[in-house]
Amino acid sequence: IIGDKANAESEDVSKEEYILSYLGIIEKSEDDEDIQKSITRADFADMLVKALKLGEVNDMQYFDDVDFSHWASGAINALAKAEIVNGNGGGVFEPDEKITYAQALKMLSKPMGYSVYAEANGGFPTGYIKTAVMTKINITLQNSDSLSMGEAIRLLYNAFSTKTYNVSSVKGSDGRNTNQYDVSDDTLFKIYYNLYIDEGTLNSYYGGAMEGASEVESGECIINNEKYSVIFNADIKDFFAENVEFAYIKKSDTQKDIIYIEKQDSGKTTVINSEDLDAFDESAYQIRYYNNNTLRSVSPRRDAEIIYNGNSETSLTLKDIIGGFIDKKYRGYVKLRDIDNDGGYETIVVYGYISLSVSGQSSDGKIIYDEYSSSKSIDTDAYEKVTFKDSNGWEYTDKLKTPSVISYAASTDKKYLEIIVSDKTSDIKISTVIESEYKIRDENGTEINVDESCFNRKKNEIKQSMNISVIYDIFGYICYIGKTEDTIKSGYLAALAAEDSGFDKKVMLKIYTEDGKLEVFNTSGKVKIDGVSYDEGEAAAIYTA
């Protein structure tokens, strides 16, 4: 799911919980156990009052067992005043008893407009359960005698996203009044929050557009030819050319703010990483690739739209693009989409990234230079729409550091440029060099790819047993190699001696290090003992100190 950054970080947050917490109806739970716990009648009353924006009532007590000292008295009184609840008989509400499924349905039926229908179809509890099935707000329960917080959230979401009922009394030919039920176009989400739940295909975003789709500015997207604002800091690219369900708040006819979006499970999708590509058979119009070490193939439609690095491509063929991956010109992926679910792939979305090690920028910051290859340098000013992202897809606003590694995807028409800044680093001790494959193994035997440009320029530092400091690109390739940072070692001084080579004098230290080894170190440059600095040549002074 995608929402604002703080909430989207937890992948376990359901759509229902996210939207209700966004609207302020509930607080997002930090503990899965809280979601599983049974809730009371008071808990559900509190949720419903917040959802309906009723406001608490604290000047009238409606139930004998809910005095003003009860934490939920204001909410329970508000529901009673609105004639949504009438208690369990005898003037009591039983606020601290566990709420049942049927009781929750009865509370929801009045604001939804279904209470008359439910009473006419059996009353409490069967009529309300039948009505829930009819309106499709029903949920699967773990326990029929109680309702968990998670179940209450789903039930409340279903009720608020379902169209309400209008009930009118109509006199028949026999003179009797009968109820007439009409489904309205309104939902409780629309009535109280101007919030809509919709679905469609994401045709355009700031970074790419399908054929015929309008271009948008930063923070916007097009779904089914309607423009929406994306008000959270997240990477909407993952939903490009996908069928999506989304929630938006309508501020005006021209201002619609998406607060939530997710992919729908409709239309077949095949994603192939560039590392798995084997070949492209032009005569069969077939892409061959490996999946779990098994050679497979997929055949898109010959008239399929190809979107390369955001732009509907006309100058490059699918053979050209696949060939570029196989020849290691760039790294990325191919996504084939059957958007209309007719069994054929009519849309092919491709992103091919070139990675470089940043050695610096032009004085105006528009040209980014590569440390190892001048041909990889990129002029951002040559592109119409430029986005910087971090490796998580969030907007990157910091100044580029030197050294650092970026991966960029540029459309052939100079319209779109996406730059992703990698933040993955590590220190490695090389155990094996596989020069023919541009790979190394670390001391744990892990095989690591090295970018070809980096490998060729840093051959002298890519040697067995050497310690290197590296920065990876977003695909796990080493694209920068530097010397490991000097480390601080501590231990016990075992012996001290002065060495006189005839040209200079140095002090040798024999130290038991933290890992239990006895090692000899030479002083170099400045030596500081108890806060006093000495030049390395002052052997006698160091020895005395």
Model-identified regions with their sequence ranges:
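Amphipathic, non-transmembrane alpha-helical segments in extracytoplasmic/periplasmic proteins
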Residues: 44-48, 75, 101-108, 152-153, ...
